[in-house]
């Protein structure tokens, strides 16, 4: 069997890592990969048509998140760059105007695209504080209220929905607390986009990060929403593209595709929630009922529609992923950006999980492309693989004997 054949027969349950590019998105991108190749900075016909395409895409992003103007949208190379721009650009600007504002508050379960820029800012003299979370991955607003009383906080950055366990955070309430203390608020909404209705005005956020490939768009493009009249510094310097905040010739095909993906996501968010959450709930019900010593992690209700995160006791998660892949299931133990580093999940550690609980964890994330039949097949395979792995474990017979 070729890799292509295996690809066609596999069941893809890893949409938290990336999503298939929608056919409508591909169709909209193609002309900008072929005959519409002008540089948007050029003033001739070829440049003008690519500029118009970027403007349309910017409008579509604006509409998806309920922004006030397309001027509030800055295109980037993805969610990671958007987070870096938000954190570093804001921190450096605020400190240049108000040197005493040198603290950044975030949570202990943020993506590395937030945690690593925070570490970099620490090297530049900033102080970062990581809020604790509950054993369900929830940031209590009271935790923020308790530590933000001093007027030295430049920025609070809390993700809208967690990429591993899917927990949705009370962003609106957290924003109010931050603003009362004179701090700006950024949210990494990479996992929330397309799964939740987004409205930056209702949430009150000052900045919001987005990524194309999480909403059935192409990889290598994202955006940062920056509230009107909010000033931040660029972290990439050059020709002054993207409102002088992100220099470099724009990735026109990617931006066009991202814009179309935003338009589709905005139209289909209700359909997405109904279809995907229905499949997810069915999957969770079957797993917990049919697979012994299994547990769902994260909040039951306040979680994004596509996410199901489990711990299977006395099973090694990496062995489980490999066996599932061999049996036609694509899944993950957690963040795709951390898996290749072979490090334990900092998210699960922050939630108080033991070593056994962390190593026995599995994330299944669904999409619009999945069907009930695929879920049934996946659960059947998962159950069989877990049984096989447990039988091979030297500790299983001892456990069974102890349980009588």
Residue ranges and their predicted role:
Residues 1-404:
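Pyridoxal 5′-phosphate
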């Amino acid at each position: 069997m070729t890799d292509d054949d295996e690809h066609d027969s596999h069941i893809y349950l890893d949409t938290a890592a990336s999503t298939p590019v929608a056919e409508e998105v591909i169709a909209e991108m193609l002309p900008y990969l072929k005959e519409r190749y002008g540089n948007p900075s050029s003033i001739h016909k070829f440049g003008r048509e690519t500029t118009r395409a970027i403007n349309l895409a910017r409008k579509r992003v604006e509409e998806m998140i309920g922004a006030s103007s397309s001027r509030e949208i800055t295109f980037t190379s993805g969610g990671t760059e958007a987070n870096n721009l938000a954190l570093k650009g804001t921190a450096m600007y605020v400190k240049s105007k108000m040197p005493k504002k040198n603290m950044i508050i975030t949570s202990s379960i943020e993506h590395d695209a937030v945690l690593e820029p925070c570490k970099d800012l620490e090297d530049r003299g900033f102080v970062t504080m990581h809020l604790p979370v509950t054993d369900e991955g929830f940031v209590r607003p009271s935790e923020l209220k308790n530590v933000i009383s001093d007027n030295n906080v430049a920025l609070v950055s809390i993700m809208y929905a967690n990429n591993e366990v899917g927990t949705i955070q009370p962003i609106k309430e957290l924003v109010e607390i931050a603003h009362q203390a004179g701090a700006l608020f950024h949210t990494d909404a990479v996992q929330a986009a397309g799964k939740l209705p987004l409205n930056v005005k209702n949430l009150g956020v000052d900045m919001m990060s987005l990524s194309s490939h999480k909403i059935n768009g192409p990889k290598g493009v994202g955006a940062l929403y920056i509230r009107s009249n909010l000033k931040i510094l660029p972290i990439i310097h050059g020709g002054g593209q993207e409102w002088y905040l992100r220099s470099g010739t724009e990735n026109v095909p990617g931006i066009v595709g991202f814009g179309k993906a935003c338009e589709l996501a905005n139209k289909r968010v209700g359909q997405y929630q109904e279809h995907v959450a229905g499949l997810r709930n069915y999957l969770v019900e079957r797993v917990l009922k049919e697979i012994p010593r299994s547990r769902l992690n994260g909040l039951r209700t306040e979680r994004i529609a596509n996410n199901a995160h489990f711990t299977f006791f006395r099973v090694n998660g990496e062995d489980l992923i490999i066996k599932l892949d061999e049996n036609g299931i694509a899944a993950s133990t957690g963040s795709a950006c951390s898996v290749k580093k072979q490090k334990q999940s900092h998210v699960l550690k922050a939630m108080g999980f033991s070593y056994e609980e962390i190593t026995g964890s599995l994330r299944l994330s669904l999409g619009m492309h999945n069907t009930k039949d695929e879920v049934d097949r996946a659960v059947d395979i998962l159950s069989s693989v877990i049984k096989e792995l447990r039988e091979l474990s030297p500790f299983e017979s001892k456990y069974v004997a102890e349980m009588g």
